[in-house]
Regions:
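Alpha-helix N-cap/N′ positions at the starts of helices
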Residues: 117-121, 293
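Short, charged amphipathic recognition helices of the HTH superfamily
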Residues: 132-144
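Acidic/histidine-rich catalytic cores and adjacent linkers
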Residues: 1-10, 15-29, 41, 47, ...
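Conserved beta-strand -> loop -> alpha-helix junction used to position metal-binding or nucleic-acid-contacting
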Residues: 218, 248-255, 260-299
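Short, amphipathic alpha-helical "recognition" segments used to contact nucleic acids or chromatin
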Residues: 120-132
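RNase H-like nuclease fold core
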Residues: 23, 56, 62-63, 70-75, ...
Length: 429
């Protein structure tokens, strides 16, 4: 049985035709389950492949070849990655020979480099910690590789797991912030902020023309201020997001978000403000006994199939509130035109209900919060918050489904320099 991908050239040439595994070792491992057997066989395979590579360099044992340019140097204790842990093994050593037959230095075995690489351990550490496994519980949550192997294993201590998690999440951060976005057919952009231990992390989510959701960036700051938002959007544009055909941008009620969007995208962005946030803000300015009735009227105005009729209803409600609750009226009027952008684009049904609020990006943010819920002590470094946030965003991406209500003829883009009252679709979902 070949225990390696034959397309892996680094290993394929060293895989032995046969493999000897001691019956005693297999029998002991069988008592601990199939994975323990696999680990026992895997260690034997790794050793056999390394010996095969040493034979290819040095020739057979006791060959006494005067033309050889490498010789064996015994073995040395080291470790390889098996079953999500580091397990001890004795690696053969090979030395290069100079023209006089003298040792010129040790030669690294390519096969050992593959077996010893720690990328798998980093991924295991990140996935388990994002799933809520604490560093102190990591050893108990490790794969059942057998009592003998577990006793000899390393890399499961709190400090080792923590180091690997930092490495893995830093890689996730680099992946998120380094993505080439030029290939995305961006139709919708959502922006919102998530609090990480007193600091605001502004995140961005793109929905492509086929309904795929893609987290595209994050920026750390004290609040959702214009500077942070503008820097985030400028970075997204620099990495290739094409908005030349227009972009629907969905945000909550924060003025800084709208200001940042307009400063970067200008007239090529149509802003849809979150209707749920608007209703919540207006209700917050009303006495408890008046909230339900007024919220029902506002909800009805937002749901009107004719956006201009809905806008008139909302303005009429604001005029009524001027007399009794002027603060609620002011809250309602702020950004009111932007509440009907999706309706003006001719989008209705489930897709419209999805795009008139920020629930989609808030769901992603909720996963970020869940993955970091076990953190008991946030250090002062901004890097820690950015790493956790990036890892949470990529974890959320794995759980995404395509946009609900997506249909082939639903317009989400508009012609250049559109008016707010009339948007002409140029790209279809």
């Amino acid at each position: 049985v070949r225990l390696v991908d034959p397309t892996d050239e680094a290993l394929a040439s060293f895989v032995p035709d046969s493999l000897a595994v001691t019956l005693g070792g297999i029998a002991d491992a069988c008592r601990d389950g199939l994975l323990a057997v696999a680990v026992e066989a895997g260690l034997a395979t790794a050793l056999a492949i390394m010996n095969e590579e040493a034979d290819a360099l040095c020739g057979a044992w006791n060959a006494r070849d005067p033309e050889r340019d490498h010789e064996r140097g015994g073995t040395t204790p080291t470790s390889v990655v098996m079953g999500g842990q580091r397990l001890p093994i004795r690696r053969p050593r090979v030395h290069a020979l100079d023209d006089n037959g003298k040792r010129a230095g040790e030669v690294g075995l390519a096969s050992y480099g593959i077996f010893a690489q720690g990328d798998l351990l980093n991924r295991v550490a990140v996935e388990r910690m994002l799933a809520g496994v604490a560093t102190r519980s990591f050893e108990r949550a490790a794969d059942p590789i057998g009592a003998k192997a577990r006793k000899a294993a390393s890399s499961t201590s709190k400090s080792a797991v923590s180091r690997r998690f930092v490495t893995g999440t830093r890689k996730a951060l680099d992946e998120l912030l380094g993505r080439d976005l030029s290939g995305l057919d961006a139709a919708v952009l959502m922006i919102d902020g998530v609090d990480f231990a007193g600091q605001m992390c502004v995140v961005a989510l793109v929905v492509t023309a086929d309904g795929t959701k893609v987290p595209v960036g994050l920026r750390l700051g004290d609040t959702e201020n214009k500077t942070v938002v503008t820097a985030l959007l400028a970075d997204i544009v620099e990495r290739g997001v094409d908005y030349s055909a227009g972009l629907l941008v969905v945000i909550d009620g924060a003025k800084a978000l709208a200001t940042g969007v307009r400063s970067v995208f200008g007239d090529l962005a149509l802003i849809q403000r979150c209707q749920i946030h608007k209703r919540r803000n207006v209700k917050g300015h009303l006495p408890a006994k008046a909230r339900d009735a007024l919220d029902a009227r506002l909800r009805g105005a937002f749901a009107d199939p004719d956006p201009e009729t809905g806008l008139r209803k909302a303005k009429r409600l604001a005029a009524e509130l001027d007399k009794t609750h002027p603060d609620a009226a002011g809250s309602l009027r702020e950004g009111l035109e932007d509440m009907f952008t999706v309706r003006r684009l001719g989008i209705d049904g489930t897709l419209a209900r999805t795009l008139v609020c920020t629930n989609m990006i808030e769901s992603m943010i909720g996963i970020c919060r869940d993955t970091s819920s076990n953190v008991k002590r946030w250090r002062d470094e901004g890097d820690m918050r950015r790493r956790w946030c990036a890892a949470g965003l990529l974890e959320a991406e794995r759980k995404f489904r395509r946009l609900r209500g997506q249909r082939p003829d639903a317009p989400t883009r508009h012609s250049a320099r559109p008016s707010r009252r009339s948007c002409h679709a140029t790209v279809r979902y």
